[in-house]
């Protein structure tokens, strides 16, 4: 078997770093608001360390090792000592700093966008040399060597099952033990449905106990099994296996989260914020998902806060079963000017929903107008920083209480800095350079509010339906609806691993479809010729992402998509290519070297609108009715990467990879309490600045010992041979 292409798994030394600036927005806060934001940020940063435990068996040790390295001395001293030793070059040290940055930016050694492994871009012996000449090693050689020996091989391993996240022998995950397969996931899913449990805040451990297969569903909480407070349920026999629901996952880290949420509560601006934080604390303390749902309800009702935040086990993209949430937390300040535009969009939402192509019976009975704000991010912890969010993800709350939309205003322009658009004509490159930021703002606004915020799920609870089973007609069959969500079903539990890419595709299509509306473009400050250019750029950018970027996130070996948004955009491109009439074309202009994407802008409002509209009807009908089989068949067809025909994407992938640009890493601020106010620190937009920001983020080495103890607790489930104790390092 050929060796894997290292460029797919490394961050190059020229990786760009950009500052996520929010100084003006933060400095405009009162002292009380700054303290509120600071303690929420601390809770988010501590909680973000949970992601290392959720990513791979070795990730907690990698964090502990690199955190010891960068806190024992300055980056400049680390660099100077390594180079002067003669055992490492300046390029070697740069490669290490970029690797460290990649680990910290993704909260683990797998990319948050794409799920592929991150390995150092320098030889193992050179990295070891830098570690052994460091101040951290001089201070405690036994601890550093113990950590290095425990994770060095895993850091560099690119065995097939280590290259990407996934089940069992096909990938790496810590949401499940390695002996779990898709069948195990389905069995556990059925058990959880029967006993009304959801997967957001748990992991699954499978082992033998007294000769019987046992599935341990371990809930995230501060409290452990031995604590007196009553817990969920006793051991249960289901399908001949023992099911054991326990708690105490990430206990020490969640204790730090709760301590900071308690402090933040002292500076809350109203009862809704206090009640929200109280419920989050209860959830993280006890493992109760209902408490987090309650906190989310308070959060939705807290309209237009000056400091916005959300925290918990949220997005399910990286669970191979699509049910378990990765921890994330964000803190941000409202951008009033941009928020006014989103407020106007919300005011028009009900009329815009009527323009969507599915029948009104497939739309929610009542549109609950959400809070929609543009935010300047102060803190975002997790495996990546999105451009926009539509939360909470709990189906029952979204249908009955509503949701919130946030556009991360300082993320959007930052993400376009220094970017080159390949595979386009010079005229289209100029169009993207001029209008891409505005077009993306339009797309994000529509995607979050009316994409994720639209559509009804048909449900049956007992003998009651939430739709008229006698009169509602399926537009694809012209007959009555014959499928729906039963009691205990959620979108995630039914659509599982398909769910994320499918829902992102639906939201992206809504954004494209409604970007044709002149009133929408006017809300975003564009009219006339400029509005037409923004509309064209919105479509061009989506189709460019589907053709020029998406296949970076596809694995030919496993024939598996590694990233939901990338798969969604590729599917949209295929739908538009299928529409014909020379609406969209991709040609190989230089054999094996270059491609050209062209979009006939005169046909967007005709051919393009019809193609996306017809596709949207199918997407929504299958989602509303829970028709996973039809959804899977359709989506798999458009997701196929073929190596023949008019568009040999499997062959063209090598051309796309040859033009690949490194993904940016965003440098965030730190805050620190000084008396009755809070100081904010900024850092250079470099690898050195990024690493420095992390070296100053936590006030003690306690986080290292907590992660090491969590690794030790789980090690027996993830290693064939019991690893060495880390007592020397703890």
Regions found by a protein language model. Name each.
Residues 51, 490-505, 509-622:
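Long, well-structured alpha-helical subdomains associated
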Residues 97-101, 106-224, 228, 239-440:
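Contiguous, non-catalytic segments that form substrate-binding/exosite surfaces or channel walls
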Residues 596-730:
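Extended, compositionally biased alpha-helical segments that mediate assembly or anchoring
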Residues 79, 83, 271-278, 461-467, ...:
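Short, glycine/acidic-rich hinge or "gate" loops at secondary-structure transitions
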């Amino acid at each position: 078997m050929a060796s894997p292409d290292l460029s797919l798994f490394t961050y190059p030394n020229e990786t760009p770093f950009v500052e996520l600036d929010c100084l003006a927005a933060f400095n405009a806060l009162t002292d009380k608001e700054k303290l509120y934001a600071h303690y929420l940020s601390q809770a988010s940063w501590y909680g973000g360390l949970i992601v290392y435990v959720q990513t791979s068996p070795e990730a907690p040790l990698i964090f502990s090792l690199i955190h010891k390295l960068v806190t024992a001395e300055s980056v400049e001293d680390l660099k100077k000592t390594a180079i002067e030793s003669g055992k490492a070059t300046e390029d070697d040290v740069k490669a290490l700093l970029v690797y460290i940055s990649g680990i910290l930016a993704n909260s683990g050694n797998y990319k948050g966008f794409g799920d592929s492994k991150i390995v150092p871009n320098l030889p193992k012996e050179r990295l070891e040399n830098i570690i052994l000449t460091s101040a951290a090693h001089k201070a405690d050689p036994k601890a550093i060597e113990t950590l290095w020996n425990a994770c060095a091989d895993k850091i560099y391993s690119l065995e097939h099952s280590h290259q990407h996240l996934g089940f069992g022998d096909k990938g790496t995950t810590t949401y499940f033990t390695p002996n779990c397969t898709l069948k195990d996931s389905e069995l556990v899913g059925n058990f959880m449905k029967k006993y009304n449990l959801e997967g957001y805040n748990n992991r699954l451990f499978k082992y033998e106990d007294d000769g019987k297969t046992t599935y341990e569903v371990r809930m995230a909480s501060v409290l452990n099994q031995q604590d007196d407070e009553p817990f969920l349920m006793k051991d249960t026999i289901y399908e001949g296996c023992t099911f054991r629901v326990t708690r105490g996952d990430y206990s020490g880290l969640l204790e730090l989260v709760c301590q900071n949420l308690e402090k933040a509560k002292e500076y809350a601006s109203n009862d809704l914020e206090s009640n929200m934080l109280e419920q989050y604390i209860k959830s993280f303390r006890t493992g109760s998902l209902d408490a987090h749902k309650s906190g989310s309800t308070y959060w939705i009702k807290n309209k237009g806060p000056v400091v916005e935040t959300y925290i918990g086990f949220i997005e399910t993209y990286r669970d191979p079963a699509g049910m378990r949430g990765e921890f994330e937390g964000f803190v941000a300040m409202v951008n009033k000017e941009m928020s006014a535009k989103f407020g106007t969009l919300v005011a028009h939402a009900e009329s815009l929903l009527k323009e969507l192509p599915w029948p009104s019976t497939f739309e929610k009975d009542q549109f609950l107008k959400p809070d929609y704000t543009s935010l300047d991010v102060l803190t975002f912890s997790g495996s990546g920083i999105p451009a926009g969010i539509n939360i909470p993800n709990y189906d029952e709350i979204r249908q009955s209480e509503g949701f919130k939309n946030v556009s991360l205003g300082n993320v959007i322009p930052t993400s376009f800095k220094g970017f080159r658009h390949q595979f386009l004509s010079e005229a289209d490159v100029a169009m993207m350079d001029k209008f891409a930021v505005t077009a993306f703002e339009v797309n994000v606004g529509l995607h979050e509010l009316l994409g994720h915020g639209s559509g009804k799920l048909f449900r049956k609870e007992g003998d009651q339906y939430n739709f008229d089973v006698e009169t509602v007609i399926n537009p694809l069959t012209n007959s009555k609806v014959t499928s729906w969500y039963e009691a205990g079903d959620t979108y995630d539990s039914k659509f599982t691993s398909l769910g994320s890419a499918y829902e992102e595709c639906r939201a992206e299509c809504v954004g494209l479809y409604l970007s044709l509306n002149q009133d929408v473009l006017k809300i975003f400050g564009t009219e006339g010729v400029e509005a037409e250019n923004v509309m064209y750029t919105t479509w061009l950018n989506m189709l460019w992402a589907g053709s020029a970027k998406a296949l970076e996130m596809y694995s030919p070996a496993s024939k598996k998509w590694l990233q939901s948004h990338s798969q969604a955009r590729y599917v949209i491109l295929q739908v538009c290519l299928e529409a014909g009439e020379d609406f969209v074309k991709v040609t190989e202009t230089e054999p094996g070297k270059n491609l050209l994407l062209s979009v006939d802008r005169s046909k967007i409002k005709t051919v393009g609108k019809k193609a996306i509209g017809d596709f949207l009807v199918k997407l929504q009908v299958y989602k509303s009715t829970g028709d996973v089989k039809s959804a899977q068949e359709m989506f798999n067809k458009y997701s196929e990467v073929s190596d023949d025909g008019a568009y040999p994407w499997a062959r063209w992938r090598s051309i796309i990879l040859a033009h690949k640009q490194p993904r940016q890493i965003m440098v965030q601020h730190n805050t620190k309490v000084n008396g009755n106010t809070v100081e904010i620190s900024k850092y250079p937009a470099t690898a050195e600045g990024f690493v420095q920001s992390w070296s100053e983020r936590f006030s003690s080495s306690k986080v290292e010992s907590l992660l090491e103890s969590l690794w030790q607790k789980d090690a027996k489930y993830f290693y064939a041979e019991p690893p060495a104790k880390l007592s020397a390092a703890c």
